[in-house]
Amino acid sequence: MVKVSFNSALAHKEAANKEEENSQVLILPPDAKEPEDVVVPAGHKRAWCWCMCFGLAFMLAGVILGGAYLYKYFAFQQGGVYFCGIKYIEDGLSLPESGAQLKSARYHTIEQNIQILEEEDVEFISVPVPEFADSDPADIVHDFHRRLTAYLDLSLDKCYVIPLNTSVVMPPKNFLELLINIKAGTYLPQSYLIHEQMIVTDRIENVDQLGFFIYRLCRGKETYKLQRKEAMKGIQKREAVNCRKIRHFENRFAMETLICEQ
């Protein structure tokens, strides 16, 4: 018996292709380097590390400052705002005692918006344009933590700063109790008017040193220091100087603040 076998042409072709693949060689240029031979200089690594450290430090500082600002901003926004007023007698040293005198007395009214932040020890007063009195609208900040008072005369768009007078300005907690009583109707104040006179002195260049709340009030405004004259009760003769008048209250009596330039 004779065994006959045939060689497949396709099998020969596949074997030839495998040999060609095995014989392929990667040819690199003479100046090329192997990937594992590439080394980053130490100076570049160090510079990159410093950049990362400074970047993280700036980001952390921004987060801290931004958080502090947002806390004060939202604390300011969340404080309750009261719209209150008191009646006062302008042409007398005290309230009349008899009923006849009480009816004939000429009462004036001060109305204003008030906001108190007890935790920060700050009072905000906004005096609108009065209907009949010849006084200026104003925004006032009493900062008990900084022991400063700031007046923003809205007619002049100027700021004035003076040490806080705690003898006439109620502390935030007591003032808040007074406002709650006024709102509840248990205390309807009928009071008198106190006069105080301030003299404009030096200009303040850096309002950022006056604390967050006064900075918020006075930034971008011309800001001046004030010097207080002794508070006077009743009608007083005044010198012929250029004065602006602000009527407000932060106690059981009304206050007329004269801001004068000599």
Swiss-Prot record:
Q: Does the keyword Cell membrane apply?
A: yes
**Signal peptide range:** none
Q: Per the UniProt entry, what are the Gene Ontology biological process annotations, in alphabetical order?
A: negative regulation of amyloid precursor protein biosynthetic process
The residue ranges crossing the membrane are: 50-70
- Where does the UniProt entry say this protein principally localizes? Golgi
Q: Which GO terms describe its cellular component?
A: endosome membrane; Golgi apparatus; Golgi membrane; plasma membrane
Compartments it resides in: Golgi apparatus membrane; Cell membrane; Endosome membrane
Q: Which residues lie on this side of the membrane: Lumenal?
A: 71-262
What InterPro entries does this protein map onto? BRICHOS_dom, ITM2
What membrane topology does the annotation report for this chain?
Answer: Single-pass type II membrane protein
Which residues pair up as cystines?
C159-C218, C243-C260
Q: What job does this protein perform?
A: Plays a role in the induction of neurite outgrowth.
Task: Describe the subunit structure.
Answer: Homodimer; disulfide-linked.
What is this protein called in UniProt? Integral membrane protein 2B
